[in-house]
């Protein structure tokens, strides 16, 4: 006897609200912060999110009879209050692993943050966290090389690495750009960097920039004996152009290239990560456009999710905020996504906004890059917050030194070494940072003038995207 079905519309919660469900190790788990339209029950909205991000649609369809809907559907299994906000709640949803293409972060994000984010029954929705099951993690390529391989490749141990974004970011000729790179590397930096919007403009075509930067690297290395690099931005208008730039960087001997992973796209990023893995190039990732996606505390995608996504898609470095600089960043949240980038296993920790355990297995970690409005006075806090496996990247805080780029670079290295030594001696470097730098400044007029130049520069604005009250 043929099966029949009841045509029409029924409430989502009849099918997708399952508070008795116990998530499996193989499930994807997602936590959404949801603000429903007035009068819509929480259970109905949570179920609607589960449906619209998995198997459901607005009406019953006869083709449901052709599959095992109970197996493939997403399940809203828990609801929690958001303390301090009566209008919002957390919806926890489990998805079977078979809903997603292996190794495709694009597949995951298309489902979880696709049409459901435009659903009329929602005033706003934000993806706060995802638990990627280990079985899925193992299908992803991840970072091309990882932290230890980079340490060995660059021969840098026992301290954070130092970088600098060349300024002004736009307008320099390739020759003058290369000159700035040389001065910074000669002064003691480990890396210099293209800014996110440096690609191939009329005033500086990419091939010219690559050549002048590589000349600067080789000249500085000959003088100092130190291995250094410049993040050559391979981001381009098409994947074909991106690969051409990466290939040229490899041919001229560059150790590292760069990609804007959000504006460039996840497909392009994963492809470039695979290329870098096969060809021995490190991959630096800029997060341009993240503020559009993650800064609104009620709508979008939290940066901790973007950090997981990038680690799985592939990158050896990722800009991660600074806490102390000019860019948005809550300390607890920052510490949470720094752990997500580097550690093999991250336990649920609501004090850092981490909603699920996350196991990355043997996947290498990503080096967090502190960049944006930082200068020498921030060095003690940066070393304390980020630790050794990081890049501390001073753009204006290097090139803005009154005595020039090379001196600015040398000053940052002096300050870094002073802070690392003090930390290794057991000092509380955040608490004693001013004293540590002032004492070193007595023996370094270059450091002293830098401290004088930036002593009044602070970025003390309230954080827009704070951890929810219950997490503190």
Curated annotation (Swiss-Prot):
Residue sites binding substrate per the record: 115, 165, 169, 287, 319, 371
GO BP annotation list: reductive pentose-phosphate cycle
Positions of modified residues (N6-carboxylysine): 193
Keyword S-adenosyl-L-methionine among UniProt keywords: no
Induction pattern: Both mRNA and protein accumulate at 2% and 0.03% CO(2), but not at 15% or 0.15% CO(2) (at protein level).
Superkingdom of the organism of origin: Bacteria
Residues annotated as the enzyme's active site: 167 (proton acceptor), 286 (proton acceptor)
A single GO molecular function term of this UniProt record: magnesium ion binding
Cofactor section: Mg(2+)
Record text on cofactor binding: Binds 1 Mg(2+) ion per subunit.
Reaction(s) the record says it catalyses: 2 (2R)-3-phosphoglycerate + 2 H(+) = D-ribulose 1,5-bisphosphate + CO2 + H2O; D-ribulose 1,5-bisphosphate + O2 = 2-phosphoglycolate + (2R)-3-phosphoglycerate + 2 H(+)
Keyword RNA-binding: no
Residues the record lists as binding Mg(2+): 193, 195-196
Keywords, sorted A to Z: Calvin cycle, Carbon dioxide fixation, Lyase, Magnesium, Metal-binding, Monooxygenase, Oxidoreductase
InterPro entries the record matches: RuBisCO, RuBisCo_large_chain_AS, RuBisCO_lsu_C, RuBisCO_lsu_C_sf, RuBisCO_lsu_fd_N, RuBisCO_lsu_N_sf, RuBisCO_lsuI
Site note Transition state stabilizer, residues: 326
Enzyme Commission numbers on file: 4.1.1.39
Free-text function comment from the UniProt entry: RuBisCO catalyzes two reactions: the carboxylation of D-ribulose 1,5-bisphosphate, the primary event in carbon dioxide fixation, as well as the oxidative fragmentation of the pentose substrate. Both reactions occur simultaneously and in competition at the same active site.
Complex and partners: Heterohexadecamer of 8 large chains and 8 small chains.
Family per record: Belongs to the RuBisCO large chain family. Type I subfamily.
Miscellaneous notes: The basic functional RuBisCO is composed of a large chain homodimer in a 'head-to-tail' conformation. In form I RuBisCO this homodimer is arranged in a barrel-like tetramer with the small subunits forming a tetrameric 'cap' on each end of the 'barrel'.
Protein name: Ribulose bisphosphate carboxylase large chain 1
Organism name: Hydrogenovibrio marinus
